[in-house]
Amino acid sequence: MAGILLVAFLSLAFGTTEGASGSSWSYGESDGPGHWESAYPNCGLNRQSPINLPNSQDMVYNSDLKPFMLKGFKNPQDYKLKILNNGHTVQVNVEEGDLTVEGGGLPGRFKTAQFHFHWGSDNMRGSEHLSDGSSYPMELHVVNYNEKYGSLSNAASKERDGLAVLGFFFVISDEENSGLRTMLNKFKDVKTNGAMTELTSFSIESMLPLAVGNPDHFYRYSGSLTTPPCHESVVWTIFENAISISEQQMAMFRKLLEDNLTNGTHVIVNNFRPVQPLGERQVMRSFELNSASNIHLSSLALFLFLVCFI
């Protein structure tokens, strides 16, 4: 019963069509992000997500942002996962297991509840957050709740420290990402809205780039859920290192359907909220700048800028 209730809330808070008020929402024109505030007032508050992450030079260095400790993510036999198409995204729920996130300057110990994706109709868009004005083809959100609140539903309604979401950008690569293969093989079973199945033998750790490059390089700000009801209870972390994905693998996401019919024609694409005003909030970085990192960031920005015009 607890698992059913958890799935029900996850669907409500992170991607169903119907909210508690019965109001519908989507990413379309009639009930898309520009209309969310009328049914979900929180969506019009001043600490909303996503945002445009400024250049690292314009961020504030925070020495308290130490490396993360992710526990329980490595061995698939230690947890039970279910993969779901909720009509807005593909989502993987943690049904059983003790997956936790702490460190990284987080205000406590957080329990992992689910992860999901946002992607575009092409490689020029898709991520919810922007990096100095540039978009990525996809973004992964790993959703965790503060254990002191006891449950995801209780934590999501709290102020500022209820949830911790880890965000990762994706970049297109010539090589297939083997860490995604097991999950992508299940897409045929969750092609339509409402479809759900078990996801076995999938190592969450293998999907994440935390063991590659600089896992202690990340950005931090205070924000909200990026879907209704838009609670401003999220400690956001966006990692500098991106996850690679091949063109063929990316195409599999774009074949998932909003419809609950196998012959449906409405594919899930452009399921991202536009960036929201940063306002008086600060974006912090976990690392000090040096000439090498400045060159890296400048080169990345130039590459993304040039790609837009090829």
Please identify what each model-predicted range represents:
Residues M1-I310:
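Alpha-carbonic anhydrase
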